[in-house]
Amino acid sequence: MRVLHVCSELYPLLKTGGLADVLGALPFAQKEIGIDTRILLPAYPKISAGIENTHVVTEFDNFAGHVVLRYGEYNGVGIYLIDAPHLYWREGNPYHDTDYNDYADNYKRFALLGWVGAELATGLDSWWRAEVVHAHDWHAGLAAAYLFNKGRPAKSVFTIHNLAYQGQFAHHHLHEIGLPEGMFHVNGLELFGQISYLKAGLYYSDMVTAVSPTYAKEITTPDFAYGLQGLLTGLREAGKLVGILNGVDQEIWHPSCDAYIQHHYKLKSIAGKKKNKADLQAYFNLPQQPDALLFVMVTRLTEQKGLDLLIATADEIVKQGGQLAILGSGAKHLEEGICQLAQRYPENIAVKIGYDEALSHLMVAGGDVILVPSRFEPCGLTQLYGLQYGTLPLVRATGGLADTVTNSTSETIEASTATGFVFQKAEADDLRSAIQHAFALWQKQRVWARIRNNAMAQDFSWKNAAAQYEQLYLGILNQ
């Protein structure tokens, strides 16, 4: 089975969000179970620097100008690079300039990505032809539309990592990207009078996946559908929209071999966790108190991530003698809000604005509770890291958070299924109650240890997702 992943990011070479983590793991897990998997990416500077010794597959001119298609390998997986410097040779973020303005030619940059994805199913590389084109998020959404326009020479899958980003462009660009006017209608590319690259992926693909079962349900409701409720509901009712949970790359995120932490540990040998906690407290200049319940949060500082809820309830952590360490950057008013808390409670709350990969690993390893109070969360990875490291996730019941964390009630503790703390409403009072619940169980260290053991015993390795995608591919290939 030959599968081509079409995407715009790849961890660790280029990352702006969780999309990169998925593409840095899923294709490699699929290769391990025997799928002939390749990845198609724009040749951004960071991508090109990380994939050396490429050779030219072909050169061509199309609506996007002169393009060279290159091929190389990265960690054993074949990589196609679209070498078009006039479109992709821009340092930094792949989607916008340093002032956060989207690039004016994004419509063309990502149309080309989809176009090449479709052409690799029809002989652009005479040595390899994709049977399944698997496109990720709006950047790759047009791949399915180009396949449709060519008579569907291969099967197509589209994965929604975040429906909030839709890739909408003015109608007048249609003639510039090689698609016929007849595809611009409500049963096609059109959304609110514009071309929607995301809708193209939804409408023209043989199968659509979301990154968790709960998110696949949520996006059929008005609060989460962003104007696509009718289409998404229809897909779900037709059995063409399913949820497949993301996994954890255990070569990077596992407490027994994490390259970023000093003290390794595992389920049956937990002593290293306490040492990591001491290291983390020292890093943030928090009192070295092993008995203080240490909450950590590694996140973008946005309302979506529930930062405003935490700011409103952090006093509960202080009142109960706990500690809170936060790493992230984002909205200025939220950065200021948490920094003010740290100034007010220096013995209890510490903040680092920015992102630091090594520190994020230490926080997951050294914390007792990892906070993910998101308003919505398609899948979420931090709670999975928390489970893996025995840092109990405290999450809101949404998206992948609802699918992966089991609230610690007397029943679930008794049944050995409890793995963390879950609250229902995106309200400060609900979060406060969950924090109080965590403190109550922290007083019962034997119970806490049982919950931590349950959490660490969960299996969210990528081999599970790889096997589910294999079944999905086989299903559409046999249609």
What spans do the regions from the language model cover?
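Catalytic cores of nucleotide-sugar-dependent glycosyltransferases that transfer UDP/GDP/TDP-activated
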Residues: M1-Q479
